[in-house]
């Protein structure tokens, strides 16, 4: 047997051995868990290996490390959030990352009062930077496509659990929230708001005040009714939560005359301004909107 044939045979044997190792499990999650989640921010191989090495459940041995480095010569790894099942082989893991077969995350938020808080909550769960989200919320030309402006946009967000991709773009994220908003405002809900002589936006603003007043569900319709009556007769709402919002100090437990006077020119102060504030003072719960 000549040297060339011997070399080819050795290469084939080594390839077969490497392939057999590629088929072995690379993921072994903790007892009681069924999966591990891996976040990939970019296609950089070293950054990817660092992420993998940080996961105790992933066995980053020579086979996996070599497979990733060899694959990176010909293919790129797609950013995203990937669920790795217990017992997943090296080959399946690498293929999933190369083909970008990412898995959606569950995005949630509640008890949000300001745009800054919302941007922070969302960015903590997504690849997006809070500034990227803030830029959309402050751009009237972008918001116009959703029938919103910088004052009304916070009413588009509804506390819920949303399935989105971790590396979702700002415009796609807004599309997701807008779709949920449109689905929520059914004909029945719109008719109810119309019967109360308010718009869906006004109902949401009023609900944000009611949400600040109480968390006890049986009280919500009563509080909403009280404010609706004041609204319809042209009386100032005199809602303490609006003054708290105007001060920007959400730790306040009691609103005094000093707080009211200090914010008297603020349009959110319903002690000094007739009607509803120009926007929500928090993102209200769906149940509170339904109570209006």
Give the location of each predicted region.
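Signal peptide-directed extracytoplasmic domains
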Residues: 21, 27-185
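Basic side chains
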Residues: 3-5, 88, 121, 212-213, ...
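N-terminal type II signal-anchor transmembrane helix
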Residues: 1-35
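Bacterial extracytoplasmic/cell-wall-associated proteins, especially those involved in peptidoglycan
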Residues: 127-131, 142-292
